[in-house]
């Protein structure tokens, strides 16, 4: 198992390859810091897809980088709808979204956790 990697500001483009698929912590665990890092990485991330459980009225950040970045969402938000073709809306219930992730596994997961302990374990709070 790969150990968690702590990122400093501006490191995202160096650790995420262009293209691919990243799950982004969202819903009530949205990180404005991560969304800003994705936006700041810009075109260096190519046509990378960012997916998550984005909720209207709660998640106002658009997690897409550069001109070719795309988002997949299971709940449509006004901010994502405004992205037009860059946003793929899949109106699935939670159970079906789990199956979608099983069929479309991300190659990266972006979330905030506590620093790892001596064994490399992290906590969500």
Q: What spans do the regions from the language model cover?
A:
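Conserved alpha/beta enzyme-core scaffold
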Residues: 1-125
